[in-house]
């Protein structure tokens, strides 16, 4: 008879192999190396907060929407890595998708379809006013929610207001949180 932990591991990982179960940690280790090598400590701090904050928020939203939370966790970690690594935000979504593909291929972490899914979400995450695939929307929503939750007293960016209101409504939080418009 299986114990509770074994049952939960099978449930959480949907029967994936041990190697697949460690994909998140393998990617986290790779990203940590990039961030640790950043000379600007303030940018490094922002990188850790934002990338891992979005990653956790992606996992939460994916679980709620019955999407792959493991891939969602990975896309959150990767989505703005190019901006922090290159210290350049120009066309960061497109450059970020290219970097994500290179990293995923180098580490052999994902199938071709999974890599395409992750790269699509990264490529489209700056287009907050446009609706893309359900998985793309997880990243956009997590990005907006992390910006807000970092400090709810900060003004909400104009292009994120509608999406934030929809998220707070989806998670039945709009009556508890006031946000700066």
Go through the PLM ranges and name each one.
Residues 31-34, 122, 139:
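A generic structural signal for nonpolar/aromatic side chains embedded in well-ordered alpha-helices
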């Amino acid at each position: 008879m299986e114990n509770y932990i074994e049952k939960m591991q099978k449930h959480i990982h949907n029967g994936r192999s041990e190697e697949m179960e460690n994909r998140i940690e393998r990617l986290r280790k790779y990203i940590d190396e990039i961030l640790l090598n950043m000379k600007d400590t303030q940018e490094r701090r922002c990188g850790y907060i934002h990338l891992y904050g979005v990653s956790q928020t992606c996992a939460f939203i994916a679980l709620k929407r019955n999407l792959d939370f493991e891939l969602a966790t990975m896309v959150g970690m990767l989505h703005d890595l190019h901006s922090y690594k290159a210290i350049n935000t120009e066309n960061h979504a497109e450059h970020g998708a290219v970097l994500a593909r290179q990293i995923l291929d180098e580490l052999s972490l994902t199938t071709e379809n999974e890599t395409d899914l992750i790269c699509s979400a990264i490529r489209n995450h700056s287009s907050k006013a446009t609706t893309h695939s359900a998985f793309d929307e997880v990243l956009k929503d997590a990005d907006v929610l992390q910006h807000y939750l970092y400090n709810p007293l900060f003004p909400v960016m104009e292009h994120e207001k509608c999406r934030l209101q929809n998220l707070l409504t989806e998670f039945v939080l709009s009556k508890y949180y006031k946000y700066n418009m």
